[in-house]
């Protein structure tokens, strides 16, 4: 079965061939069939190819490996394997509280009406900065982390709702008066500057120990 990426390349190739036909033989547009070919070459096929390509990019840009393909993100990828439950990203990643293949996207998209589009636009900006600009060092979020992203998954979960601590401050959490990540509760995040002093979880080694037993 032809994948989206292959289909996009095929459509681009078809568009180029049709455009060459029109350029080499402009007289072809004098006929009705020629006008149809020109319309396909200049409008329909490019639009469809762009749509397929954009859709494929949208899907690929959600992948964890896409985010970590930028060298400046490498330590953030390593932090997902820190063997310490207080590291919030690591605890979520290692315990499958978030999809492993969409770990970055799951926590860093905006769960609002146009959140996905906003996240994609930021992703395109990251690609632009990576290739043509100068990434900030250290990197940081554009805006303070919104509790909405945490509550999207945790609100309604028994482990969250049954916690007296959460119950008392739920209104302040929803209004962002108290931050989940910077108010002394869950504030150990990627902490990339401290990766040299921590232990790392090796899932392959863990599986080997289980097999040995």
Locations of the language-model features?
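Short sequence/structural segments immediately N-terminal
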Residues: 1-213
């Amino acid at each position: 079965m032809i994948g989206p990426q292959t289909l996009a390349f095929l459509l681009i190739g078809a568009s180029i061939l049709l455009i060459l036909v029109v350029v080499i033989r402009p007289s072809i547009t004098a006929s009705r069939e020629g006008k149809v070919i020109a319309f396909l070459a200049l409008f329909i096929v490019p639009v469809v190819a762009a749509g397929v390509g954009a859709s494929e990019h949208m899907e690929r840009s959600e992948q964890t490996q896409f985010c970590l393909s930028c060298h400046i993100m490498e330590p953030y990828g390593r932090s997902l394997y820190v063997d310490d439950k207080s590291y919030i990203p690591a605890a979520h990643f290692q315990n499958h509280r978030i999809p492993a293949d969409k770990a970055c996207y799951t926590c860093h998209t905006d769960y609002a009406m146009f959140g996905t589009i906003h996240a994609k636009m930021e992703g395109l900006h990251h690609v632009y900065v990576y290739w043509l600009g100068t990434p900030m060092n250290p990197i940081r979020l554009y805006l303070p982390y919104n509790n909405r992203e945490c509550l999207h998954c945790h609100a309604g979960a028994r482990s969250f709702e049954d916690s007296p601590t959460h119950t008392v401050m739920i209104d302040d959490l929803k209004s962002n008066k108290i931050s989940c990540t910077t108010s002394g509760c869950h504030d150990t995040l990627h902490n990339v500057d401290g990766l040299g002093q921590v232990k790392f979880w090796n899932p392959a080694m863990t599986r080997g120990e289980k097999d040995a037993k």
